[in-house]
Amino acid sequence: LKALAVLLFAGGGAWTGQAYLPWRAWGADVRTALGERRTITLADGTTVVLNTDTAIDIRFDDATRGVRLLRGEIMVTSGRDAARAVPRALVIATAHGDVRPVGTRFSVRERGDATRVDVFDGAVRIAPRRAVGRAPLITAGHGADFTRDALAGPPRVLGASAGAWVDGILVASNLRLADLLAEIDRYRPGRVRCDAAVANLRVSGTYPLDDTDRILDTLRETLPVDVEYLSRYWVTVVAARD
């Protein structure tokens, strides 16, 4: 698997054009487990924070500083590549295309049908895999989703919850309960399900990602819901019984 991973980086076109297969994450250069976050510093000074269940490959050559997101979510603070007289381009490759920062701090999340980018400082250019023409520029305080063909919609303004996971916090602001539980599900083994009867309840609050049991207890205390455990690994949030 490692040998194959190296081949993916044999030139920018070969690397970014390869099909993305789930098993490639198994042999990734850096991985995190469910519920784990990890910070690494690359040779050029770039800092990468890996969120839960994330896998990346890293490849630097004479022209490019490459990070390939195979699964999950990362926060990137781009380094200056100061050891080089001419800094190399930093490229974050995803299943849907490339993200090229312009001196910036940004996050990239693989969402299955699209890639999500949030920009906190500076700007990034997004190059969908099959798109032609100039790559759109996303500036600080904005985010965008993109597929292999194009941006999935106009850039959006970032909310207060964007990037909070780096500090181990999940921020909900009038969020559907079903959407909150889908986020919690990313951070614990097994499954967290939401019954349709309570899916549209609205939730606001700040929750600790490192203690998902506590989050579930808090929801039970503050909403008209109950939490049913078939086991620790199969949890369903349902309407509270009278």
Feature-to-residue mapping (PLM):
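Single-pass transmembrane signal-anchor helices and their membrane-water interface zones
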Residues: 2-25
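Short acidic/polar N-terminal linker immediately downstream of export determinants
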Residues: 19-42
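Short, small/polar residue-rich loop motifs at catalytic or cofactor-binding pockets
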Residues: 34-36, 61, 111-113
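His/acidic/aromatic-lined binding-pocket segments of jelly-roll/cupin-type domains
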Residues: 39-40, 47-48, 57, 65-68, ...
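Extracytoplasmic/periplasmic/luminal assembly and interaction segments
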Residues: 48-93
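Extracytoplasmic/secreted envelope proteins and their assembly/folding machinery
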Residues: 66, 71, 89, 121-123, ...
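Short, polar/charged, low-complexity connector loops/linkers at domain or secondary-structure junctions
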Residues: 84, 89-94, 99-186
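N-terminal export/assembly leaders
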Residues: 150-242
